[in-house]
Each structure stands twice: as C-alpha cells, then as structure tokens.
C-alpha cells in the first residue's frame, strides 16, 4: 500500500447522497480479482451514455477535473453490497481520499484496507469544500488530521491504528509480517501430528 502522509491535489465534487457500490462500480465489471483495470468503469452508468459514448455533463468527464485525487461527496457513500472492487475502481482512477458525510461500514473498512482514505466531515464543512474550483487544491494532512482548503482548516477523526497503517504504507499483511518471527516460534512449539 502506498504511504499517505500529506496529499495536496485537485478535488472533484459529486455531491449526491446514497451513492451505492453498484453506482460506483456496476456488477458486470466484477470479473477480476486484480486491483487494477477498474478505473475506466468507475461510475460507469453516469460517465457513459446508453450508446457507450462519454457523457460530457458528468463531472469526471470534464477536462478540468482530470487528475483529481480527492472526491467530495454526500452522505451514505458506499452503501449496498460489499465489494472491494468499488474501492479498487476509485483508487485505480487516481483517488487517494473520499470526503463524505458518512460511509457504509463495510465500504469504510474496504477503503482503509485498500489505501483509500475515507474522511467524514459535517455538512457545513463539506458545503465549503463543494465550492472548490478545478484549478484550486485541497490538502489532507493525515498526521495532524486536518483538511485545508482556501484558508479553511477542518479536523477529522481516524482510528489511530488505521492512521498508522496509512502513514507507514502498510496493509494488514504487512502488519502481520512484523510478527513473523513470533509466529514461527509459536508454530515450532506446537506438537507435530504427522
């Protein structure tokens, strides 16, 4: 997992509430277990018209939003079925963080385990962030748990263990491997049933 300490980048706003995992990545694209290749299918039914052509009105398709690394959204983001693929689509597209009013518990956990930082901010603060212009940047300072935009600073909470994993660029396997010697020693002490 790529370390996340401080991210300064452009943001795109999709202010809708209740964006579920089938909207984030429709079910027909769940045929792969690799974590890459899903970005082109992100928000597929919104990004593309019925004939398969790009929908020029959708925010992600506007040239001024190309390369955005932060998604600002509404409440209840990631509801619906549990699919890590939805998180993989967001990260494969290039998002490093999603700022919302709330997240589905399962989506939140999938995000933290796959290097996508979910940040919960109240409506008043997200309303200020919704005014971000395509040429402006937003900064997320994870060690200090601060989102900065246009001289506004917003504090967010994160579990200290998840924060450490992001800062150190460690997933669950990396953390487990820190205990490899202890695991091996434990295994050697167990009786052999061969």
Swiss-Prot record:
Pfam families: Aconitase_C (PF00694). Pathway: Amino-acid biosynthesis; L-leucine biosynthesis; L-leucine from 3-methyl-2-oxobutanoate: step 2/4. One of its GO terms (biological process) is L-leucine biosynthetic process. Keywords: Amino-acid biosynthesis, Branched-chain amino acid biosynthesis, Leucine biosynthesis, Lyase. It catalyses: (2R,3S)-3-isopropylmalate = (2S)-2-isopropylmalate. Signal peptide: none annotated. GO terms for cellular component: 3-isopropylmalate dehydratase complex. Its EC number is 4.2.1.33. GO terms for molecular function: 3-isopropylmalate dehydratase activity. Belongs to the LeuD family. LeuD type 1 subfamily. Heterodimer of LeuC and LeuD. Catalyzes the isomerization between 2-isopropylmalate and 3-isopropylmalate, via the formation of 2-isopropylmaleate. HAMAP family: LeuD_type1. This is 3-isopropylmalate dehydratase small subunit.
């Amino acid at each position: 997992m790529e370390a996340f300490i401080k991210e300064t980048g452009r943001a795109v706003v999709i202010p809708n509430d209740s964006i579920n995992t089938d909207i984030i990545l429709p079910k027909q694209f769940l045929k792969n277990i690799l974590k890459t290749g899903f970005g082109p299918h992100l928000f597929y039914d919104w990004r593309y018209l019925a004939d398969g052509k790009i929908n020029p009105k959708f925010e992600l398709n506007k040239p001024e939003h190309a390369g955005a690394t932060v998604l600002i959204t509404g409440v209840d983001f990631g509801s619906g079925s549990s699919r890590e693929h939805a998180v993989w689509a967001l990260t494969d597209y290039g998002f490093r963080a999603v700022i919302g009013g709330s997240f589905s518990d399962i989506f939140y956990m999938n995000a933290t385990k796959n290097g996508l930082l979910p940040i919960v901010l109240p409506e008043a603060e997200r309303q200020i962030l919704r005014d971000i212009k395509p040429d402006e940047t937003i900064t997320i300072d994870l060690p200090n748990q601060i989102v900065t935009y246009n001289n506004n600073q917003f504090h967010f909470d994160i579990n200290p263990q998840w924060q450490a994993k992001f800062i150190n660029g460690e997933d669950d396997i990396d953390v487990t491997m820190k205990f490899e010697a202890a695991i091996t020693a434990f295994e050697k002490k167990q009786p052999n049933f061969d």
